[in-house]
Curated annotation (Swiss-Prot):
Organism (species): Mycolicibacterium paratuberculosis (strain ATCC BAA-968 / K-10)
Alphabetical list of InterPro entries matching this protein: ADC_synthase (IPR005801), Anth_synth_I-like (IPR019999), Chorismate_C (IPR015890), Salicylate_synthase (IPR019996)
Keyword Magnesium in record: yes
UniProt pathway: Siderophore biosynthesis; mycobactin biosynthesis
Protein name from the UniProt record: Salicylate synthase
Gene that produces this protein: mbtI
Annotated function: Involved in the incorporation of salicylate into the virulence-conferring salicylate-based siderophore mycobactin. Catalyzes the initial conversion of chorismate to yield the intermediate isochorismate (isochorismate synthase activity), and the subsequent elimination of the enolpyruvyl side chain in a lyase reaction to give salicylate (isochorismate pyruvate-lyase activity). In the absence of magnesium, MbtI displays a chorismate mutase activity and converts chorismate to prephenate.
Keywords: Isomerase, Lyase, Magnesium, Metal-binding
Active-site residues, record numbering mapped to chain: 252 (proton donor)
Coiled-coil intervals, chain numbering: none
Claim: Manganese is one of the keywords in the record: no
Cofactor(s) in the UniProt record: Mg(2+)
EC number of the protein: 5.4.99.5, 4.2.99.21, 5.4.4.2
Length: 450
């Protein structure tokens, strides 16, 4: 067992780091710590991978629950309730800022439906629709390839970490793959309806999705470990929060706001399969880079993101960089671009999030028409799907990963969900095939819960 000194730390402080043995994968360790520290105790938690580190937020010291008709802040067994109206961004932002007066980071998720208010479509939501869950954790553990750092954790939890290192991370059971080609939601027919509406001039693009029910309960931490080995996400996450379990491998950022005010979003649009051998991957890439439908889809998405960035950025700072390069994400490859700007002096991170949310690559163009079409044509409320998993910091930073390529569990049901961007040139069969390609990011790697 690794030997280090042990000390009790207060919330926000840190204890001496623990070296990570070279034979232990940091993603495996972080997921196993989620099991040992939270799953077995029935605690809520969120694991978030960003830039070579895995941040595990465990236990709830305070919780912000934003619904379509009420804001609740729960702390020390006391619930403060507030009815609200208007935009959800300022309401959520104010609640977040209050908690960040006492701690340095909060974690949570934001539902797709958070974004309908910007377009005046909130009357379409059912009463009590969940919009966001954000919490102040009791403890936080950061795992990198070199070390483990504990923040606000007790001596007992440090001992648990040392125990996992001493025992080693357990092996994984075999996966139980699910068939991605079933289509009980008549996805092809919905695509055809959208193409007809686009041809009639109602909007230019919409992302329609379909659900794939999983016929068994999923072991989410084990699935995270196995699928992470087969994916190359920009962010990944594992969570049990607000009545939802989820595991996912985010292909893109909805928004990242740095402490110095730089805002970044990374729209991915245009898709082909990946991971089918070097020759097939090269052929698919060549087709992706030359296909007029995919190029048009990407270009109009980037233009929309640039316009949104300009709304909240200092004049002249909104720019596109790394335009239309191929980015590999597990079982698929995409055309991707980076859009950035410097946050205007009259705006804050929630203004940036509201301007960019929901992601253009998960909604439509124009967004108002795309979101309205989704509420009519898509397969039920989206919830966390195409929303965001977020990390918010006291220094003004925000990191919001687009919630795609994920598995979900709620009310005893488990499912995957994937979509495709529909434009006038779309064909139902190809868009269905694209959803199959995206579902294959996770479908082969599901491990059943024992």
């Amino acid at each position: 067992m690794t030997e280090v000194s042990v000390e009790t730390t207060s919330a926000g402080s840190e204890s001496p780091s623990i070296p990570l043995p070279v034979h232990i994968d940091p993603a495996d360790l972080a997921a196993e710590l989620a099991v040992v520290l939270s799953e077995r105790a029935g605690e809520e938690y969120l694991l978030y991978e960003r830039g070579g580190e895995w941040v595990l937020a465990t236990g709830v010291r305070a919780m912000i629950e934003l619904d379509s008709d009420e804001l609740r802040v729960i702390r020390d067994g006391v619930t403060q309730r507030q009815h609200w109206s208007g935009r959800p961004g300022p309401v959520l932002g104010e609640a977040i800022d209050r908690l960040l007066l006492e701690t340095d980071q909060l974690f949570g998720w934001i539902a797709f439906e958070f974004g309908v208010y910007r377009y005046g479509l909130q009357q379409r939501l059912a009463p009590g629709t969940a919009l966001a869950r954000v919490f102040w954790p009791n403890g936080r553990i950061v795992v990198t390839r070199e070390a483990i750092q504990l923040f606000g954790t007790s001596t007992g939890r440090r001992d648990d970490v040392l125990g996992v290192l001493g025992d080693g991370v357990p092996g994984l059971r075999d996966a139980s793959a699910v068939d991605v080609v079933t289509d009980p939601s008549n996805y092809r027919d919905r695509v055809a309806s959208a193409v007809a509406e686009i041809a009639a001039g109602r909007y230019h693009k919409v992302i329609l999705s379909r659900c794939l029910q999983v016929p068994f309960a999923v072991d989410f931490p084990s699935t995270y470990r196995l699928a992470r080995r087969h994916n190359t996400p920009v962010r990944s996450f594992l969570l049990r929060l607000g009545g939802i379990r989820a595991v996912g491998y985010s292909p893109e950022l909805v928004a990242a706001v740095r402490h110095d005010g730089v805002v970044v979003t990374e729209p991915l649009a245009g898709t082909r399969a990946f991971g089918r051998g070097a020759l097939h991957d090269r052929q698919a890439r060549d087709d992706l880079e030359s296909n007029s439908k995919e190029i048009v889809e990407h270009a109009i998405s980037v233009r929309s993101s640039l316009q949104e960035m300009a709304e909240i950025a200092e004049p002249g700072t909104a720019v596109v960089t790394d335009f239309m390069t191929v980015r590999e994400r597990g079982s698929v490859q995409h055309l991707g671009s980076t859009v950035s700007g410097r946050l205007g002096t009259s705006n804050d991170r929630m203004d940036a999030l509201e301007a960019l949310f929901p992601a253009v690559t998960a909604s439509g163009i124009p967004k108002a028409g795309g979101v309205e079409a989704i509420l009519r044509l898509d397969e039920g409320p989206r919830g966390l799907y195409s929303g965001a998993v977020v990390m918010v910091s006291a220094d003004g930073a925000l990191d919001a990963a687009l919630t795609l390529r994920a598995a979900y569990e709620h009310d005893g049901k488990t499912w995957l969900r994937a979509g495709a961007g529909i434009i006038e040139e779309s064909t139902p069969e190809r868009e269905f095939e694209e959803t199959c390609e995206k579902l294959s990011t996770l479908a082969p790697y599901l491990i059943a819960r024992q």
